[in-house]
């Protein structure tokens, strides 16, 4: 995800494998390292909850969790989630059943259960990540339904891209460049 931030800042596709572009992104990431307190999501989340950091790159569901924790702690600061004007990434968690699954019927029943509106709403409340289930969405409080961090509008989504699998060679390139960023 760190590379995505630099790619969007520089106007590159988040799935680029262009070495010149990625070197430029790497240089940006190295230049901003003195400002970074954490890259790992759990550390980022904890620093935001503790008021130690003023800015973070964080998933929308994590931000809802952080906002709830800050409010529950009685802290005297508010946190706002924004999608940068350059855009961000869009991601989707999915449930899949392998074609050779031994208990395919049970897996289908579990997915059907999780897709029930009431259960999807409960799952959303527990994991704090947005639900794509329209019936569950209708059960949410209007404050949550109107939370653009969870449910961005079409204008914000139009600025965002989906990560693609770049193959072993692409993964290796990103891994090598990330090692160089961390080593600095």
Q: What does each model-identified segment do?
A:
Residues 55-76:
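A ligand-binding cleft/hinge motif common to bilobed small-molecule-binding domains
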Residues 4, 37-38, 47, 54-59, ...:
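Structural recognition of the beta-strand scaffold that forms the well-ordered cores
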Residues 7-12, 91-103, 122:
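A bilobed periplasmic-binding-protein/Venus flytrap-type ligand-binding module shared by bacterial periplasmic
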Residues 98-158:
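Mature extracytoplasmic/periplasmic domains
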Residues 44-45, 53, 107, 120:
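Short, hydrophobic alpha-helical packing/hinge segments within bilobed ligand-binding/sensory domains
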């Amino acid at each position: 995800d760190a590379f995505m931030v630099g790619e969007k800042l520089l106007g590159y596709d988040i799935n680029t494998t262009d070495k010149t572009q990625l070197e430029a992104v790497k240089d940006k990431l190295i230049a901003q390292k003195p400002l970074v307190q954490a890259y790992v999501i759990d550390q980022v989340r904890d620093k935001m909850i503790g008021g130690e950091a003023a800015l973070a790159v964080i998933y929308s569901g994590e931000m809802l969790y952080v906002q709830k924790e800050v409010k529950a702690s009685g802290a005297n600061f508010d946190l706002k989630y924004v999608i940068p004007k350059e855009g961000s990434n869009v991601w989707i968690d999915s449930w899949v059943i392998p074609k050779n699954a031994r208990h395919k019927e049970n897996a289908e029943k579990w997915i059907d259960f999780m897709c029930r509106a009431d259960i999807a709403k409960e799952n959303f409340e527990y994991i704090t990540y947005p639900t794509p289930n329209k019936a569950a969405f209708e059960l949410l409080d209007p404050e949550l339904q109107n939370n653009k961090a969870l449910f961005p509008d079409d204008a914000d989504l139009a600025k965002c891209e989906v990560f693609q699998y770049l193959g072993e060679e692409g993964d290796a390139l990103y891994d090598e460049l990330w090692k160089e960023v961390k080593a600095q």
